[in-house]
Amino acid sequence: MDRVSNLPDGVRGHILSFLPAKHIALTSVLSKSWLNLWKLIPILDIDDSEFLHPEEGKAERLEIRQSFVDFVDRVLALQDDSPIDRFSLKCITEDEDMLPQEMFVSKTLVKLKIRNDRCVDWWCGKGGTSLPMLKSLYIDSDLILWGKMKRFLSSFPVLEELRMASMEWKESHETVSSASLRKLSILGTGCEDYVNPKSISFDTPSLLYLNYSDLVAEDYPLVNMGKLLEARINLIVKDDQIKRVREPNNDLLQDDAGNVVLQFGNVVKLMNGIQNIQILYLTADTLEVLSLCCESMPVFNNLKTLGIKSEEGRGWQAVPALLRNCPHLEYLIIEGLLHNVTDKCGDACDCISREDKGRSLASCPVKKVEIQGFRGTMREINMIGHFLRSFKCLKEMGIFPEEEGPTNFENPGAFEYVEKILKLYNEISNCDVYFLVWGYMRRKWTTQ
Amino acid sequence: MSSKMIVLMSSDGQSFEVEEAVAIQSQTIAHMVEDDCVADGIPLANVESKILVKVIEYCKKYHVDEANPISEEDLNKWDEKFMDLEQSTIFELILAANYLNIKSLFDLTCQTVADMIKGKTPEEIRSTFNIENDFTPEEEEAVRKENQWAFE
């Protein structure tokens, strides 16, 4: 006896909702009573990798792709009758494929995630985009095209989470404006042809979390995010700009970067806008850019956690000013100690001998320091010693070795030596110093 | 501390005494308790005793507290054994869970049936559930063509 077909529609629909789209579509052929059942399902999870793999070459067959595209079109067209709560679409498309129009006009869609390895072309057709209920939008692609940001965002009046990675600004003056946005993740590549934007403004008064990675803009005229709690900022400096960043007033430098880089001091406006923040992560490039506004750096009164990432090609010029301006810092995370030595990383590190060293550190109330990517070089060990002597309130220092790149530990005996020194530091300082090494690493570095 | 008991009556006239805290995992029963109409027992016209026994077994297991401290992992293993049932019983359970509005049991039973569908061709699905194919060959061909991508 066929018990399953006699179950109420809602129940059968619930059973189907546990299946991926392909299997749901299959049931349409079981019998007449199953023909239209799939249309009742409020959650749709479409992943074309199921039917494209393992048979390669399937995707290229036009009829298959067309029928898949039609299916998606039809699913989205059903919205008026049976609203879709959640829709996830993962598929491999050619450049010519555009997203179905219905995706941009839906009265009920709440969450949308789009991922395309090559390019996502947001349709801005005649009717424009209207997704009045959309709360979360995630777009991941090598290139996202959507027109002007202001118009784009105005289509989502209640949007709370937005992720765009990676994208290019259409105009050189752009504004991110949304009263409802709480989480924003922008991974950008400047304007067309990898050019620095002229100005980027943020009018996002409800924003709590920001992940902003992009070429440095020449100006940040408006930064309205007073409620921001946490930010990760990566202001990318192009290779042909770094010299000018370090010597902004050097007239002898012959480069094209001049005019643009001289504006980078406006980054201070971005810093001013986020000065109420509690958790801040800055990359090596960002630190270089901040060196242009050390004197005007705002005070981060609420900052408890600061993370900085270092690279050997980038300097710590901004670190003393940063530390001085965080009067309530508790936790400092340093990913990579080695950095480009200048005479401006001043008293933060021990690289250049100076008399007044350590002052920005001495007044810093940080209680816990975490050092990641430790390579076991003498320079790093000296820096660690310098921190231990200078941070007056330090209670705990955790050191984690570099797991992937080259380290000094490959030299025979180096690991044991470093471990001994760190143990010594632990004994002679008031602070708890520990060096955490995975078993496999220890074995790798001690069997020489 | 003595716990409050309520009486559930199956469609075939059998009575089952159950702790109130266990029974109100069913939203339907929970509402009746709120509306205070449980004094003479709760008649469940749509659930026969054979199924009600299983429902009560499920609810007891899922009533996690100090007396019954069970981990999610163990619950998952228990679910597997619990759902080792004849097809007809599974469908009865689905209907009971739906009627009694016990979300986790409803999801579990539906997931079990979904797992029976997944990975099978339409012919295999029909065979598993005894579904009669009432399409004409032309009609079936048309349906397959419409969702061609799913059938390849």
Curated annotation (Swiss-Prot), chain B:
One GO biological process term: protein ubiquitination
Subcellular location: Nucleus
Location (main, coarse): nucleus
Top-rank lineage group of the source organism: Eukaryota
Family as reported in the entry's similarity comment: Belongs to the SKP1 family.
Gene name per UniProt: ASK12
Keyword Iron carried by entry: no
The protein's annotated pathway: Protein modification; protein ubiquitination
Pfam families: Skp1, Skp1_POZ
Region of interest (Interaction with the F-box domain of F-box proteins), residue spans: 94-152
Record's GO cellular component terms: nucleus; SCF ubiquitin ligase complex
Alphabetical UniProt keywords: Nucleus, Ubl conjugation pathway
Tissue specificity comment: Expressed in young seedlings, roots, leaves, floral stems, inflorescences, and siliques, with a slightly higher level in inflorescence than in other tissues.
Organism: Arabidopsis thaliana
Keyword Nucleus: yes
Its biological purpose: Involved in ubiquitination and subsequent proteasomal degradation of target proteins. Together with CUL1, RBX1 and a F-box protein, it forms a SCF E3 ubiquitin ligase complex. The functional specificity of this complex depends on the type of F-box protein. In the SCF complex, it serves as an adapter that links the F-box protein to CUL1. Plays a role during early flowers reproductive development.
Official protein name in the record: SKP1-like protein 12
Known partners and oligomeric status: Part of a SCF (SKP1-cullin-F-box) protein ligase complex. Interacts with ADO3/FKF1, COI1/FBL2, EBF1/FBL6, PP2B10, At3g61590 and At5g49610.
